[in-house]
C-alpha cells in the first residue's frame, strides 16, 4: 500500500 502512496498521493485512498 505504501509503495503506491509514494508515487500516487491520494490515489491509494481512492481505491
UniProtKB/Swiss-Prot annotation:
This is Antennal odorant-binding protein. It comes from the Eukaryota. Keywords: Olfaction, Sensory transduction, Transport. It comes from Mamestra brassicae. The lineage of its organism: Eukaryota, Metazoa, Ecdysozoa, Arthropoda, Hexapoda. GO terms for biological process: sensory perception of smell. Antenna.
Amino acid at each position: 500500500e505504501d509503495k503506491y502512496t509514494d508515487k500516487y498521493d491520494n490515489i491509494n485512498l481512492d481505491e
